[in-house]
Amino acid sequence: MNRDTICVQGGYTPGNGEPRQIPIIQSTTFKYATSEDMGKLFDLEADGYFYSRLQNPTCDLVAKKICELEGGTAAMLTSSGQAANFFALFNLCEAGDHIVASSTIYGGTFNLISVTMKKMGITATFVDPLCSEEELDAAFQPNTKVVFGETIANPALTVLDIEKFAKAAHAHGVPLIVDNTFPTPVNCRPFEWGADIVTHSTTKYMDGHGAVLGGAIVDGGKFDWMAHADKFPGLCTPDESYHGITYAERFGKEGAFITKATAQLMRDFGSMQSPMNAYMLNLGLESL
């Protein structure tokens, strides 16, 4: 499907006699016949829903549409764009790690990285997005885990050279996260230029009506986590809170990142978008 069609039809294909618009599943919990069925969900052995703090069918339909628009392999919604950026970064970083980021990013995200995440033991080096390749390379440290930038900076409007930043990130064995809020995938798809993870504040142009807060994270499904297992223990070593599963082994390049962000971060922080907000976001996407 072309992008115009995805805006309207993506993420949801109603069957005969089913609603034309995506249904609003305004429910906190979901019923299962046996405790064994529920147990498989808790152990990540089966797909499904049990608590809307982690996942909700309405939200997943809209996330799937955004995933299709970006050309990714997996996606999730969050309660805001700030939550999306925090989840994307914290899904890879822990105390003692380092981030390389564009210096012209949105002020809220700049403070998230430079102030709040610093309190969590995560440091950062900010670089001019127009810097030379040599200057960019010099910003990396042995403990660098991710590179972050915005396709078009908010509000500076500086355009990120995604290919340059992706090349540098990959040379150091780390992924590039690009906040694609301003262009949206209608005007730019960062995965086509080398980005590995894309985030959005859907509050802006995706909603398009100033009606609902929201965020999204999309995985391009190409970064090989296991090839850099020493850098990403959260993805490549057993998770004791889920009976020792290893996300990169169980879900592969295509699904490990979003599964971990959902199973760990959404479980613990609960920054889930509401079904009603997701429904209204979908209306905005239809006219994107």
Residue ranges of model-derived segments:
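N-terminal start-of-domain structural block
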Residues: 1, 56, 60, 190, ...
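N-terminal "arm"/small-domain region of PLP-dependent enzymes with the aminotransferase-like
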Residues: 1-56, 64
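Conserved PLP-enzyme active-site core in the AAT-like
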Residues: 7-13, 75-288
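N-terminal targeting leaders only when they are immediately followed by extended low-complexity/repeat-rich tracts
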Residues: 16, 50-53, 65-68, 129, ...
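Short, basic and Ser/Thr-rich N-terminal targeting/leader segments
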Residues: 19-20, 71, 120
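Conserved N-terminal alpha-helix of the aminotransferase class I/II PLP-enzyme fold
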Residues: 34-86, 108-116
